[in-house]
Amino acid sequence: AMKGNTKRSVQMTRSGAFGLQHYGTFSWSGDILASWQEMKQQVPSGLNYSLCGIPFWNTDLGGFFYWEFEQDPKNPALQELQTRWMEWGTFMPLMRNHCSSPMVSELYLFGKEGDWAYDAMKKFIRLRYRLLPYIYSNAGAAVQHSNTLMRALVMDYAHDRKAATRNDEYLFGRNLLVKPVTDPMYTWKDDNKRGHLIYPDVKQAAAPVEVYLPEGNDWYDFWTNERLNGGQTLRRPCPIDIMPGYVKAGSNPPGGTDGQESAGKTW
């Protein structure tokens, strides 16, 4: 069916083996449980996949089975998990949420304008569109030069022993260091799987997240533009709409405007 077709096709596939990168495929981690433990395990899973030389990988954002949260998008505990997973998805090769019925994980079901979960997720969806030129250029490098998009720190900082042991943060492309938030800060869940806010205002519960900045170059905080020395461990406060991110000093990642769909981009 593709004979004579000059379009570059892509296919999603659950399974594969060494050499999968030879074909136009995206893989994902299968039907996983919506839980903090599962999310935390997905980070090294994606890095291991990339270390095998397969660059295009993703997860079901938020997980696939929502049994642990009553399958209710209004459950505050689920809203926090979904928000953090969507934030992480902004820095995956493919950003895609998907789940098992009767649960539906569309943004508008988690709230409305002015609600903390809705606003945070919308912020990162828009950021994804602004990052598309950077993502596209790194995807091209993956195809043409056998690179990967999710880069375990050991790939670029093998001389840095601390970096080599980190499996909870990575370089997205060559120039963006990201650290997914994989623990709850704002909610707790009772024995009936119902979530509750720890504080009435989620801004009161912003806890710090430990981030290691590899040595060998300086880094700029993605959100504040503060310049920081490499080779140090930070405790970065993370409000619900912030995920730790750092830009490698001396780089200039291309960006663009947000939009409704990638087809509307002119680059």
Can you name each region flagged by the protein language model?
Residues 1-243, 248:
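Catalytic-domain carbohydrate-binding cleft regions of carbohydrate-active enzymes
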Residues 242-267:
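Accessory, solvent-exposed terminal regions and/or long lumenal/extracellular loops of proteins
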